[in-house]
Amino acid sequence: MREPTFLVLAALAGGRKHGYGLIADAKQLSDERVTLGVGTLYAVLDRLAEQGLVAEAGEEVVDGRHRRYYELTDAGLTALEAQIERLESTAAKARKSLAARVSTRPAGGIA
């Protein structure tokens, strides 16, 4: 799963959101490393909707602007949970490899 897809699913885990809210949440979730462009966001949302992982969750007009809301489906929640488990497993293995490398370095030297 690509990072923009993961960030959109993670942002929707907190409840339904509109496009601007998803962009802001993705930026916050990534510690401001990722700013989703509008085109990227809606391409991700369209793909996730086709896969049954997100669904439209209503529309409204706020300050004269049309907002469409999205929410996770049960399948989307399952996919997000599975990706979190994969990322945690990968991170744990990377930490273990790093710890092994650090423990085999000669004192004062670079291995």
For each predicted feature, which ranges?
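Basic amphipathic alpha-helical segments that dock to polyanions
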Residues: 41-48
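N-terminal helix-turn-helix DNA-binding core of bacterial DNA-binding proteins
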Residues: 1-40
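Glycine-centered, phosphate/nucleic-acid-interacting loop/turn motifs that mediate DNA/RNA or nucleotide
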Residues: 52
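Basic, amphipathic "hinge/linker" alpha-helix immediately C-terminal to the N-terminal HTH DNA-binding motif
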Residues: 61-84
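Amphipathic alpha-helical dimerization/coiled-coil segments
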Residues: 78-111
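Short beta-strand "wing" residues that participate in macromolecule-binding interfaces
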Residues: 56
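A cross-family signal for key residues in well-ordered alpha-helices
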Residues: 10, 24, 46, 81, ...
